[in-house]
Amino acid sequence: MKRSIVLILTVFSVLQISAQRNEIFSARIASLQVVAGDDWLSPPVINLGAETPMNIAFDDLTHEYHRYTYRIQHCEADWTPSEGIFASDYIDGFAEGNTIDNSEESVNTNVLYTHYSLQIPNERCSIKMSGNYQVTVFDENNNDEKMFTACFMVVEPKASVSLNISTNTDIDVNKSHQQVGLELNFGSLNVTDYANQIKTVILQNGRWDNAIINSHPQYVMSDGLRWEHSRDLIFDAGNEYRKFEMLDVNHTTMGLESVHWDGKSYHAYVWKDEPRPSYVYDEDADGAFYIRNSDNQENDRVSDYLTVHFRLMSPYVGDIYLNGVWTNDRFLPAYQMKYDDMEQCYLGSVPLKQGYYSYQYLILGADGTTKPVPSEGSFYQTENKYQALVYFRGTGERTDRLVGYQQAQLK
């Protein structure tokens, strides 16, 4: 008989996330993409031992060839490097010193660049342990300068994870929030001390800036855990992401008011973003982006770069940033909007490669937390995607493994 216990007070191990998000250190690097197979709409997660590769691609904004090498590092659930294991525990082949051999120069573009790409696994290395992974790329031509880090996850589905999304929350009902329910079945895992062995992460649209880390479960069963109407798992619903597409440097396409050449570079102006007082469904990509051009051929080396200009019509409400997968979920000066008192709006500009982009505006508070911009609205109907990550460290084991993953969307 399954036993269920309501948790009155339990000390659940605290998990502080360090730096999961991709990070670019060199101004030469642009358009960093980390994609599982060809699924650019989902977070970078692959199954251990599956044929789906992890694809990492980027541009170096020069036509000079650079000999890039990379290091693969297994990380704990909190994204700190795993110090209790050896590289041979998680990699078949070589964990560092591998070169990125695939490169091609841009053709007929105003902005010169060289496109580089790699797949994992490859003939030099393959992954043999689940968990979090960080790939660091170095420029061997320049004293092994660190160029960027790219993050992805490998899951071995040992545990069963189910997610449900509700607009009936402990804050409001069918208004501006969404609540996540989570049920975890231990499956074949030998869980003797769940509070120290199990770690959970809940993401909204793959974002780590508002991730819910190690929320306390409401119920403990002999074979699993359940989170039901947990106040910790309530998210601002926000609104559907905005979107635009740059396919041609001479003509406007979806979401663009104008495109022009100033004698030195191309500029694209997104239609000004007016307040959204009510919810209107608009299919989007939840922050994802996809590089392509009007011919949809040789997208990686024929697509050009344009300076994209954004305008958000809003009174001043604090520090507002552009956010999407293409910002690497980071709140940097390059993505901060500047307020124009004369125009009563926020203005921003970012150089981007031709393609499809979805984006949102977020307010960044002094405490580092983010929230939706009031003029953008927050509506319970918003079709957000949620992801659950479950990590496990068994008795006597030396690192955290990713043993469960699930994604669900509010419909």
Predicted feature residues:
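Short acidic/polar inter-strand loop motif in beta-rich domains
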Residues: 77-79, 125, 139-147, 207, ...
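Basic K/R-rich, polyanion-interacting modules in nucleoproteins and related proteins
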Residues: 268-316, 400-411
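Contiguous beta-strand segments within globular domains
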Residues: 31-76, 173-186, 295-310
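Low-complexity, Pro/Ser/Thr- and charge-rich linker/hinge segments at domain boundaries
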Residues: 23-24, 154-177, 380-404
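Bacterial Sec-dependent N-terminal signal peptides
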Residues: 1-21
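Short, compositionally biased P/S/T/A/G/V-rich stretches that sit at domain boundaries
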Residues: 20-49, 156-171, 283-297
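Aromatic-rich carbohydrate-binding modules that target alpha-glucans
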Residues: 91-116, 208-217, 307-354, 366-396
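Ligand-binding face of N-terminal immunoglobulin V-set domains in extracellular IgSF glycoproteins
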Residues: 110-140
